[in-house]
Each structure stands twice: as structure tokens, then as C-alpha cells.
Amino acid sequence: MAENIDPSAPEGSAESAVQAAPVPIHTNPGQLSLLAWIESLGGGLAEGVELFNDEEKGHYIRASKDLPSGLSSGTVVARCPVAATMSYLNFYPTLEGLPKHSFKYNRQFLRGTEPDVASAFLLMDQYLKGDDSPWAPYIKSLPKAENLTTTQYYEDEDLEWLDGTGLESIRAARLKDWKEKFEEGKMLLKYAGNTAIESYTWELFLWAMTIFGTRAFTSRVLKEFAPKSTPDDKIFSVLVPLVDLSNHRPLTKVEWHITPDAVGLKVIDGVKPGEEIHNNYGPKNNEALMVGYGFCLPDSIVDYRMLTIRAPMESPLYDATKRQNRMFPHKAHRYESSDYYITNIFFPFGDESSTIEKTVFSQNLLDAMSVIGANERDVKVIELEEDRIYIPVTNFGRSRSFLSGLCCLQQQLSNHIANANKGDYLKKTPQNEKQRNAQIYRQTQSMLARNAVAVTIWLLERAKDANWEENKHKVLNRLLDQLPEDWYGLPVRDRMRSLLTERESCVKQRELYKNHEITMHLPEKTRECFNEFTGRIQTSLDEIVEELEVDLPCLELLVYSMFIRFCVDTYKYLGPEKSKTALGPRLTKWAPLILESYPDPSDHDLLPEDSDTDYLLTTIHEAIVEMRENDIDTFKPVEEYAGPWVDKHGWLSRRSLRWAWYVAEDELLRVSYPPYSLVAGYPPEAPSKPVRRRSQDESDHEDLYFYIPALNEAEG
């Protein structure tokens, strides 16, 4: 199979020869000069291949319309002599077969600059020499600064189109880095006695660096000419005239045709008459294309989006990374942005048998978000390997961290959607090519984020819905209804539908519960007893709740806290075997997990840190004590399960209730509500905060769900 041309991939080879073809009438004078120069050095275009120019694409190569059957597979369509290339090798005069030049430099300059920076200075120098440069025909054919569209050339109103995209900071960092390299290089050339340095302006250097960045190939294309790359074995970029006129198209099957004296481009698939001949830069995403090449593809199936994961100090991920560094000191562990990404739902390099999650999210992203979403119980089981930090989410009770990570990821992605919509640039009319590229970039970034948010909604709904198999198609239709029709045609919607409904998922059904849903796994008799008891408790507390202005989240936490106490005290009082009848198999397995993970208040007095919560729980406890004194019959049925009431150590004692509240907060997940609005591009305004600091305002757009892990199929 053919290998794509990619800086990180090996090149192919070919046996085909190139026959120089007559220049067609479409070639303009500038390109004719370039082509004539290449032909004079022994290169050129294959028969039936022509240079073409139009306003939209500029100069490119294509198969002639006059060809009866197009170009066959294996044709070497363009060939550039090594003598026409420009690269770091031109600083090594002992290498034969390269053009001679008069650029003034010394060894200190080469030692003090990176290969591509040195090459940019060479290109500047040759540009200033005009017709006296051996590369004059090529340099004349290169685009002028005003025609370059990389982000480095965005100014004034163009820059506004990058607002909130992340490209702003990338652009600023690159310009700062290049400016420093420019100043350092000029200083070294001054010491080398170069008298032309005053002519080496920042603007010209920016142009030269951009030319190398947008047109150059890897030094591997010269491996037959210089097998060791350079005398000091450096990797560098190479300008390959004529061949560099081929434009990028993802997944195009092409190979290098490399000989000791030339670099050629060979097509693997046939090319029809009049069809453009493309190159393949590798699976680059639109961010890389915008920054490195100055264009953007609206429908690239190989697109993906990098996410920045910042682990706050003392967070689980931060602490785990520190421990990993101590365990594996020989390897510097830094989480790079390339580790965290979301992919296009059509991404062709994934495993078709993979789960929904791993189709859209990178494994490192899933691992990191799970660790970030870890609670006190999850932190204890974080696994450290040389190249991985993760929580074994397949073990009983460990999927909570994964679900929590999905909630965090959903929040972050919804903010990305909002940023893409910022300034309403998706609806404005671009005034030039740079603005058109920026608009396409915003749209593709928004689509990637929307697709990923749709997946998180689907997975979290799966974890919440008791009748998932019955309701999942309703969820799917609601999701698809929120997607912009002008962006999401039938093929995209069909792909989303098949992805969500036909692939397996790591997320188990029904592990998240809201309010009284948590009792559904209690056997019917036990459930009726518990619900009747808690109903009377809540009725008695209505006046207190109204007086204290207790919000809905606190009432939900109270329900969860009483449920936790009931289950763990029933388990302790009745024992494992009898608990199976009283609690059911799922809660009988869950109760000891909670007791083991959170020390009982008889050993550690775990109190809520918030003074308002402390006051609320004290008031509630006092009301429960008073209620028991006045209506002891309400408590008797429950005591058959949870044991006799003992004021200091009973299942609703002051200390026990505080402990249960603490556990409830730690086991909760905060899920965005209404979730479907996130796909439409309307994220919550307030950022996510720890549960115990949740305000009344936040209840408008987040729901509290309690986590109870599912049993394996054999256990259930």
C-alpha cells in the first residue's frame, strides 16, 4: 500500500521516469521561467501534466484535459533536481551537486541557530540578490508577503476573527519566538562579518520563515543524495521547487520518488483528465493547517481538536503526576496538548470496533478527565504507569470518576462552543481569504465540540435512564434536532446515529439517580418502609426548610444522606446475608464499599466544612429527635432494618447524619441541565464548582445526581 507523504512517515520509491512535457498555453510567464529553469537542470513535469492557475487556488498542477484516459497509477508527475532545492545542506560546501552562493556566515552562526532559521536567512539573502541568485526563477515564483494567509499575517480586522479561538495565543507565541530567533541570528551574522545584515529586515525574515513553513518538505526527501542528512545528522526542511505546487488533500495516495539527483512525486491512484494532482501533508488538523499553511478545510474527515487540560495544584491529576515523576525519574512527564484531543466522527484512523467514547475522545483525555473527576474514594485507587495515569473504571464502584470526567468535559466543550460563536463571526460576511479561513475554522471547531458534547449527553443520559432501551431513540432525535441543519447534512446525521446506536459503550446503564429514584433498587417492602418514613420526615421539616430558606440541592442532599445512612446501618445491623433480602444484591454490595471508603464517624468525626451546612444539619437533627419523642411509631418500622435508635450512634444521630452528608457530597455528580441546549450552543453561564460550594443560582442549570454502581451482568 502507498504511504502518505508526511513529515513523520517513511517515503516510498518508484521506478517510473519523468518525461519533460511541452509547456501548455495556460502557463504564465513567471511559471514558465520556473519550469524552464527546472527543465534546464534535468527535471520537469510528466507528459500529460500541466501547470494551471485560477483565482481561487492559485498555481497548481493537474492532468491535462486532452489526455484520453488520464494519468495511470505509478506516474511520477513532477521531478525536481536536487540542484534546485534549498535547505540546510547549502551550508555544507563540500557536498557536490548543490548551487554555490555567496551568503556570508561562519560556524558560530550554524551552531547558534536552528537549521530552518539558518535556511530562512539564506532565503532572505538570495531574495535580496535578485537575478544574481542561483534560485532566482524559483524565488520570483514565490508568493509575496501580501498574499500569504498564515495567522502570522493576520492584522487589524483579520485578527478579530481569531478572537476566542486559541489561534491568537499560538500566533503571538510563534511571532515572539521568531522575533527572538531573528535578532539572535542577525547578531551572529554581524560577528561573522556579514555586511548585508541591515537589509535583513524583520518583515523579510517573517516572509522567509513562512515560505519554509508552508512549502518545505522533510529532509528525508534528500536521503538518497545525503544519506546522513547532514554531517552532524540534523533534521531540517527542504524547499523543492515545482513539486511544492501540489496542494494538500487528506488521504490522497502519493509517494516520493527519490533518487540521488532528484525528488519526484508519484501518484498511486489514477488521475482523470483535467483533475488536480494533490499532495498529502499527512493527517493534519485544521489548527495545524491554519497556523502552518494558511488555509482551512471545511469538510476534513481527519480533523481533530486539541484540548488543554490544566491540573490545578493539589488536584488529583497534579498530585498523581508528581508521584509518577518520582517513580519514573528517567522520563520527564509533562502532559502535552497532543495527548488530549477529540476527533471528527468520520475520523478514518480509528478502530471500527471501538467503543463510542474511544471513537471521539483520545484515551489520554478520558484518563485525565477521570482522574480530574475523582472523589476521595477514587483517588485511593489511581494507577500509575510509565506513560499513563488512570483509574481502573471497569472495577465495581470506579465508573463514577469516568462519569464525573464526562461532566467536566461537557462543561469545557460547551465553553468552546460559546467561544466559536463569540462575536457572531459564524454569521458575518468575510471580506478576504484570511477571514474566510477563520470563519471555516470557527465552524469546524464548533462542529467538533458539538459532536463531542452530543456524545457526552448520550452517555450521561444512558447512565441516568431506567428505561434506556425504550427511550434511547427519543434521546437521539432530540440531540439531532439541536444540530444546525445547514452544517449537519444527512450523511453527518446518519454517521452520528450509527455511532451512538451501533457501538458499545463503557458507560453502564442506570448508575445515576435523582432524588427519590435512589430507592428503586430496594426490594418493594423495604422501599415502601423507607419512603413512608422519609416522607413523614420531610413533611415535618417543611416549616424549618421554609424558615431557613433551604434550596433544592440541600433538600436532595438530605434525601441522599438519609438513604446512605439507612443502607449502611441496615448492612451493619443485619449482616451481609440478611441484607440481600432487605437491601437487594446491588445495595448489599454497595454498602460495604461506602463503609470501607469513608471511615465511620465512630472512628473519624467527618464534619462538613461549611458553617451554614453545619447549622442546617444541627437544626434538622434536633427536629428529628423531637419528632421521635412525639411520634415513636414512625421510627419503629425502620429500626427493624437499621437497628434501634441510639441518640449518639443511631442511624440518624447528629454525627451520623453529618458523615452521610459528607459522603453524599463526595458521591454526587453535577450534570448540566437542560443538556440539549449545550449542543445548540447555549452553555451555562456560571462555571462548574465543587458540590459543597454550590449556590442557589447554579441550581438553574445543573442537576445533582447520586451515583450507585451497577453490578456485573452475572451478579445482577
PLM features per residue range, with description:
Residues A2-P81, Y88-P93, P137-G716:
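Long, positively charged leader/targeting segments at protein N-termini
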